[in-house]
Amino acid sequence: MKGFFYFDLYFSGMSVATSKTFFSAFLKTLGLLWGFILTGLFLDSNLMQQWIAEPQWIANSVMFIGFFLCFKNVTLRIKEQMITAVIIAVLGEYLFSIALGMYTYRLENVPHYVPPGHALVYVGVLYFTKTAFTKLNRRLLEKIFTIIVLVYAVVFLIFENDIFGFLMTTLTLLVLRKRPRERLFYLSMYLTVAYLEIVGTNFFCWEWPSSAFNVFSFLPSANPPSGISFFYFGLDLGCLWLYKKRHKIAWNRMKNQRMIMLKSS
């Protein structure tokens, strides 16, 4: 776990940044993240309650350890974005879960492992999109991931009457049509969130009501809804917006460098 998503460290003998096969790129970023998600949510699951009366403190402890290992190994820029992600996630979780009742956690609280978990999801997806393999095969991955997203949303619509999730998926894909530079990042985020939600709801860590926000009966929802990553995008955009505001000069310099590269290509 010491090499969490860090370009300059080596995991299995290869740098994450230079991973040139899908297996290598996935294993060292999303694979590691998905495995950590599975482990952490299992520790807060109904299965763990068969052995420990209240296991959530264990899940919290494991998350804080994982967050620390990741945080100390990433760049200063990513450190800042991780802190921002945690702050935005705290506000978002209390707004959507506690205030609006969009979903409900097992103990009707916001578990301490959730906000830092948002930050790890952000970092894991970000580094997957920065690997050598994804850079070389970006368009192919975008097509494959889009097909998977569509199939996933349609299956939930047909078999779970997930109109709310399908609507969120449709909005996501429409937004991504005009954001080609971020498309692979958000498609990867969609799939990661779908995995996270399936694991979390099947472990009874949280649940979603049968309609959107448990209010809009004309928007039936599955548990979980398929396209809920649409709301995760607010976290990512918030991190990016705050970073740009704090580092205007560096951000403008990076934009100018991109324009030069595009003109010369």
Feature locations, PLM:
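Aromatic-rich, lipid-facing transmembrane alpha helices and their immediate juxtamembrane interface loops
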Residues: 7-265
